[in-house]
From Swiss-Prot:
Keywords: Aminoacyl-tRNA synthetase, ATP-binding, Cytoplasm, Ligase, Magnesium, Metal-binding, Nucleotide-binding, Protein biosynthesis. Its main location: cytoplasm. It catalyses: tRNA(Phe) + L-phenylalanine + ATP = L-phenylalanyl-tRNA(Phe) + AMP + diphosphate + H(+). Its EC number is 6.1.1.20. Disulfide bonds: none annotated. The gene is pheS. It is found in: Cytoplasm. Its cofactor is Mg(2+). It comes from Coxiella burnetii (strain RSA 493 / Nine Mile phase I). This is Phenylalanine--tRNA ligase alpha subunit. Binds 2 magnesium ions per tetramer.
Length: 328
C-alpha cells in the first residue's frame, strides 16, 4: 500500500505542477482529496489491513493528504500572484509618456467683457434691461428722433424684414420701452446684440453694445463726463485719458464722441458716443424737457474687448478659432 501512496503523491505533484488556473486546481483537489477522491478511497482500505499495520498506514495517508494540500495551497498562491502581475502589467502607466490634454471650455472674451460691464454699472446704481432684437421702425428710429430721410434708415445700413420689422441697429429701443413702462426718473443700461450692414477690420454685421440712460431733474453733461471717466477707469483698472469731441446724433443734443489715449501708439482711439437726451425724444414719451433732462451713451462691447485684450482685428472674436479664443 505504501507503493500506492507514493505513486499517488507523485501523480498529484505532476497534476498540480501542470495546472494553469484556479478552476483546474479545484478539479485536482476534488480528484485527490474529495469525498470520492483517490486518497479517500485508499484511506477506506486501511481498515482491511492487519491491526498492527493500521496506525502506520493511517499516519502515512494523513501525511500525504497534508502534503497534497500544501501543494495545492502553494500553487493557488502562485496562480493568484501571476494573475495579479498580468493585470498590473496591462494597467501599467508609463510615466515617461506625454500626458493627455483635456480641452476645457472657457468664457468667450466678449461674454467676459459683458459681465464685467454689467457688474460695474450695477455698482454705480444702474438697472440692467433687455429687449427684442427684432424691432419696428418706431422704436428703432422714430421715437429716437431719427427721421425717415436719415441715412441710417436706408437698406444699405439696416437689415429689414417685411413690413416695418428690422434687426435693431442699437439697444436704444430698450430705453424707450423701459421709459414707457417705468416713467422717470430712470437710470439703466441695455446690453445686447445689434446689427448693421458693415464688415471690415473694426466692424462686423453683428456686434454687441451697451447703452446707458439717465433721466432726472438735475442731470448735466458734467455728470455724464464724470460717470464715463469713472466707468472706464474701473474697467481698464487704471486711470485713462479721455477726449470729448463734438459730434452729432439725432437722439442727443449736444453730442460727443469719446476717445481714449493710447500711450503705446501715441494715438487716440474712439470708444463711444454720448450726449444729452434730445428734447424731442422726451416729448415723444410725454416727458416735459423743461422739467427733466438726461444723458445717454453707447459703447461697443467688442471695441472694449479689443482694447482690453489688445486685439487688432474685431473679426477674430467671431471666427471660432480655438487657438485664438483659448488665450483668454
Amino acid at each position: 500500500m505504501q507503493n500506492q501512496l507514493n505513486a499517488l503523491l507523485q501523480s498529484a505533484k505532476k497534476s498540480v505542477a501542470d495546472a494553469q488556473s484556479e478552476i483546474v486546481l479545484e478539479e485536482i483537489r476534488v480528484d485527490y482529496l474529495g469525498k470520492k477522491g483517490k486518497l479517500t478511497e485508499l484511506l477506506k482500505s486501511v481498515g482491511q489491513m492487519p491491526a498492527d499495520q493500521r496506525p502506520l498506514l493511517g499516519k502515512a495517508v494523513n501525511e500525504i493528504k497534508r502534503e497534497i494540500q500544501q501543494l495545492l495551497n502553494a500553487k493557488s498562491t502562485q496562480l493568484r500572484e501571476k494573475s495579479l502581475q498580468e493585470k498590473l502589467n496591462k494597467e501599467k502607466v508609463d510615466i515617461t509618456l506625454r500626458g493627455r490634454y483635456d480641452h476645457l471650455g472657457a468664457i468667450h472674451p466678449i461674454s467676459r467683457v459683458s459681465e464685467r460691464v454689467s457688474q460695474l454699472f450695477s455698482m454705480l446704481g444702474f438697472q440692467i434691461a433687455e429687449g427684442p432684437e427684432i424691432e419696428n421702425e418706431y422704436y428703432n428710429f422714430e421715437a429716437l428722433n431719427i427721421p425717415a430721410d436719415h441715412p441710417a434708415r436706408t437698406m444699405a445700413d439696416t437689415f429689414y424684414f417685411s413690413g416695418d420689422k428690422l434687426l435693431r441697429t442699437h439697444t436704444s429701443p430698450v430705453q424707450i420701452r423701459e421709459m414707457e413702462k417705468q416713467g422717470v426718473p430712470i437710470r439703466l443700461i441695455a446690453l445686447g446684440r445689434v446689427y448693421r450692414r458693415d464688415l471690415d477690420q473694426t466692424h462686423t454685421p453683428m456686434f454687441h453694445q451697451v447703452e446707458g440712460l439717465v433721466i432726472d431733474k438735475r442731470s448735466t453733461f458734467a455728470n455724464l463726463k464724470g460717470l464715463l471717466q469713472q466707468f472706464l477707469n474701473c474697467f481698464f483698472e487704471k486711470d485713462v485719458r479721455l477726449r470729448f469731441r463734438p459730434s452729432y446724433f439725432p437722439f442727443t443734443e449736444p453730442s460727443a464722441e469719446v476717445d481714449i489715449y493710447q500711450p503705446r501708439t501715441d494715438k487716440w482711439l474712439e470708444v463711444l458716443g454720448c450726449g444729452m437726451v434730445h428734447p424731442n425724444v422726451l416729448r415723444n414719451l410725454n416727458i416735459d424737457p423743461d422739467e427733466y433732462s438726461g444723458f445717454a451713451f453707447g459703447i461697443g462691447l467688442d471695441r472694449l474687448a479689443m482694447l482690453r485684450y489688445e486685439v487688432t482685428d474685431l473679426r477674430l472674436f467671431f471666427e471660432n478659432d480655438l487657438r485664438f479664443l483659448g488665450q483668454f
